């Protein structure tokens, strides 16, 4: 019983400490009933850079890793021009191209989608910088 309470507290704390991006779109999320969760969001950070974020959490151990692919403002504008969409529509564009609402993905599938998004951004001719909290 005690282990379950700790698990639920850690899971709640982790979810409440989640960051927010401006115009954030949830691209894909793994099955919420699994002990390991993973998801991808896209949006704009506080510096108005376009960001795609992979969030990986092992709820049993409390391990959490976030990996950001950050596209600077100028490159994000070039990407929007290339895709013929407004800059503010980039998160929705990524959602439309890579979104998965089935909620049955496993973390490895989520990571594969993140790689596909990175490859797509390169194919649009933009550079990104990878950042991680680990």
Please name every model-derived segment.
Residues 1-20:
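N-terminal amphipathic/basic-hydrophobic helices that include classical n-h-c signal peptides
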Residues 13-14, 26-31, 107:
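Intrinsically disordered, low-complexity segments enriched in polar/charged residues with Gly/Pro
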Residues 48-73:
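A short, structured beta-strand/loop element
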